[in-house]
């Protein structure tokens, strides 16, 4: 039986199965190699082309970003030299653009198409708020002109009440515009609008006050934020290892602290450059002032050198018991500290807002940079702090001719103004500034004026 050839197929079948399995495995491996080779040959050229295109795109974006950076810097300094009025116009333009971008990011445009009053109400509340906040600060520069026209004088004198009435009209308009099915969106939009008004328009108003207090208090905070942003990036890419905050993964602790050092150094340098110019340090009394105007004033004491006594330990080691320095340098270091440790959180807040609504930039108004908001997100919080710091530690609250005139025109009637002028003339006559002959002539004029006012009343 064992010699029968028909009894051997069992062993032969096993060998056949093994050989077929090996051949199949080899064929599959070879096929996979060929497919992988074909795939790599077909993908490689595309990858190279896409890499080249990416590099070209980055170069182009860098070029555009650089060009527009110089355009913005040049425009900023031209505006600065043009005068305080143009700086205020720049701030107003930035706050309006920022408001528009923030509202656009946080609003559902598809639903707004069915609610046209939503956009109208947003803009109405914006200009009402600007009129309320900035109107009072700017009216004083045109007080004498407004007084000549009864309507304008009424608007200036009753500014707060008029603003309240305007806001009340907006409130009524909002309630009348409510529609079923859109209530959640409409109330949400109203809340967002008020939040943006608070974070943008109110803080921009404080920056405008910085301009009126002296361009130094506008220029230095802006410069410190820019320097901090630059060195946070440079220190971050050079030394950065520790992530600073979850919402901005690229921000590092090393960049944050390194920028603090360089911003403090920059504050000393910028103060040294800016403080000698009275055009920058003097409060403005005439909005027609520009760089070529001879703007002079009695300098705030912080811009004047003062003697500071050093602790005895310094005298023992270096034989120096006092130093003479302008106090503004110490204040500049305080501003630099805020610009480094707190102002960046304005940018982090903006980053969180963009992530919430899944957008890369707030807009495309500045090629290569994004929107206006992307560039000024830290400036608002810095500017508001600078104003509060100035009012708390720097301002002397001096009484100027403009403030006295504003008080007189807003609170006295015509008869009281005539009486005030009469008293002032008598005072100047007693001091010998007005001669007796001129005093008699002026007295006659005022007596006639008083009689005419009495008859008219």
Curated annotation (Swiss-Prot):
Gene behind the chain: CDS1
An individual GO BP term: phosphatidylinositol metabolic process
Pfam family, one: CTP_transf_1
Catalytic activity field: a 1,2-diacyl-sn-glycero-3-phosphate + CTP + H(+) = a CDP-1,2-diacyl-sn-glycerol + diphosphate
Enzyme Commission designation: 2.7.7.41
Keywords: Cytoplasmic vesicle, Endoplasmic reticulum, Lipid biosynthesis, Lipid metabolism, Magnesium, Membrane, Nucleotidyltransferase, Phospholipid biosynthesis, Phospholipid metabolism, Transferase, Transmembrane, Transmembrane helix
Effect on the protein of changing residue 102 to Y: Reduced enzyme level
Protein name according to UniProt: Phosphatidate cytidylyltransferase
Membrane topology reported for the UniProt record: Multi-pass membrane protein
Membrane-spanning parts: 71-91, 154-174, 188-208, 214-234, 255-275, 330-350
Cofactor(s) in the UniProt record: Mg(2+)
Protein purpose: Supplies CDP-diacylglycerol, which may play an important role as both a precursor to phosphoinositide biosynthesis in the plasma membrane and as a negative effector of phosphatidylinositol 4-kinase activity, thereby exerting an effect on cell proliferation via a lipid-dependent signal transduction cascade.
pH effect on activity, per entry: Optimum pH is 6.5.
Subcellular location: Endoplasmic reticulum membrane; Cytoplasmic vesicle, Secretory vesicle
EC class (word): transferase
Family of the protein in this entry: Belongs to the CDS family.
Cellular component, GO annotation: endoplasmic reticulum; endoplasmic reticulum membrane; Golgi to plasma membrane transport vesicle
Record note on quaternary structure: Homodimer.
GO molecular function, one term: phosphatidate cytidylyltransferase activity
Protein's pathway: Phospholipid metabolism; CDP-diacylglycerol biosynthesis; CDP-diacylglycerol from sn-glycerol 3-phosphate: step 3/3
Domain of life: Eukaryota
């Amino acid at each position: 039986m064992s010699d029968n050839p028909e009894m051997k197929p069992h062993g032969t079948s096993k060998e056949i199965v093994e050989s077929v399995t090996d051949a199949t495995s080899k064929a599959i491996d070879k096929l996979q190699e060929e497919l992988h080779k074909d795939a790599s040959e077909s993908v490689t050229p595309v990858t190279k082309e896409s890499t080249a295109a990416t590099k070209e795109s980055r170069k182009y974006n860098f070029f555009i970003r650089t060009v527009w950076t110089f355009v913005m810097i040049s425009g900023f300094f031209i505006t600065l030299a043009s005068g305080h009025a143009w700086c205020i116009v720049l701030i107003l333009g930035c706050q309006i653009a920022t408001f528009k971008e923030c509202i656009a990011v946080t609003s559902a445009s598809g639903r707004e198409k069915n609610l046209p009053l939503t956009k109208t109400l947003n803009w109405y509340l914006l200009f009402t708020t600007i009129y309320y906040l900035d109107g009072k600060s700017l009216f004083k520069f045109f007080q004498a002109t407004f007084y000549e026209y009864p309507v304008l004088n009424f608007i200036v004198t009753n500014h707060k009440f008029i603003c309240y009435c305007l806001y009340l009209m907006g409130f009524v308009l909002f309630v009348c515009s409510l529609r079923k099915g859109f209530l959640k969106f409409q109330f949400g939009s109203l809340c967002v609008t008020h939040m943006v008004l608070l974070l943008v328009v109110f803080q921009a108003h404080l920056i405008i006050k910085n301009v009126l207090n002296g361009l130094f208090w506008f220029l230095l905070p802006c410069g410190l934020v820019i320097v901090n942003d630059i060195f946070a990036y440079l220190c971050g890419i050079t030394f950065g290892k520790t992530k600073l905050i979850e919402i901005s993964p690229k921000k590092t602790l090393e960049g944050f602290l390194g920028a603090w050092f360089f911003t403090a150094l920059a504050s000393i340098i910028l103060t040294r450059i800016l403080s000698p110019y009275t055009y920058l340090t003097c409060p403005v009394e005439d909005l027609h002032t520009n760089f070529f105007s001879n703007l002079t004033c009695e300098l705030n004491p912080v811009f004047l050198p003062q003697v500071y006594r050093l602790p005895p330990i310094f005298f023992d080691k270096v034989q120096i018991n006092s130093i003479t320095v302008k106090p503004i340098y110490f204040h500049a270091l305080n501003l630099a500290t805020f610009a480094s440790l707190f102002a960046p959180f304005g940018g982090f807040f903006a980053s969180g807002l963009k992530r919430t609504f899944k957008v890369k930039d707030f807009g495309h108004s500045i090629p290569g940079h994004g929107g206006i908001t992307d560039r000024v997100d830290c400036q608002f919080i810095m500017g508001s702090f600078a104003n509060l710091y100035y009012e708390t530690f720097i301002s002397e609250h001096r009484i100027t001719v403009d403030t006295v005139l504003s008080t007189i025109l807003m609170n006295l009637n015509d008869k009281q103004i005539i009486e005030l002028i009469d008293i002032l003339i008598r005072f100047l006559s007693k001091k010998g500034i007005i001669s007796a002959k001129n005093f008699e002539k002026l007295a006659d004029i005022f007596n006639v004026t008083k009689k005419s006012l009495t008859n008219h009343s």
